[in-house]
Amino acid sequence: SYAVDINELNWEYGPTKSSIGSKAKIVIPEGYVFLGKKDAAKFMELAQNIPSHKEYIFAPEDLSWFAVFEFDSVGYVEDDEELDTNSILETLKRGTEQGNIVRREKGWGTMSIKGWEFKPRYDKQNNLLEWAILAINDTDNSEIINYKTRILGRSGVMKVVLVADPLELTSSINSFKHALVGYDFVDGEK
């Protein structure tokens, strides 16, 4: 176990450019920060989230929200596929229940998925699939909203989870999408 302060992480401060593995590149604008894989895993632990050790973190400097990027090499995904929203929600609930087992082992609070904040929809302008899940922190009953995005690429999808205060969700999504203009798959993944 390690004890690390969030300020001790190796933050990359904008304006700069960075990579998300070998699949994508991102421009970090002024006022934003980025963490590579090693420090992103530490950040996830500090935020009491289970790290995959494949994620990257992008956020405004004040950390009023943060986005977790992780590539999933599922192959090409059609943007016109019919979505079974009930099946997606059940899969998310099962994943949360499995995650709660690990959270309990670590002495962290658990969470429960309440339902959709909004159902999956395709954003043609930004070539991404998006939805938002409303969850409850089981310890203090506070609401949590995870805005999830799938940016479609040639050999898979970039999974992005935006973690934000429910009261700030709309402004956080707008800020995130505005900053996302600096994201692009590398050649061969577009």
Task: For the regions a language model picked out, list residue spans one by one.
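Conserved polar/disulfide-associated segments of primarily extracytoplasmic proteins
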Residues: 4-17, 21, 25, 39-146, ...
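Short aromatic-glycine motifs in intrinsically disordered, low-complexity regions
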Residues: 14-27, 167-178
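Non-catalytic surface loops within mature trypsin-like serine protease
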Residues: 22, 30, 73, 164-166, ...
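Short conserved aromatic/hydrophobic patches within beta-strands of well-structured domains
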Residues: 30-36, 182-183
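Soluble periplasmic/extracytoplasmic beta-strand elements of cell-envelope proteins
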Residues: 33-35, 68, 159-161
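Short, surface-exposed beta-strand-loop junctions and turns on beta-sheet-rich folds
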Residues: 34, 41-42, 166
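Extracytoplasmic/lumenal ectodomains and periplasmic regions of secretory and membrane proteins
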Residues: 135-190
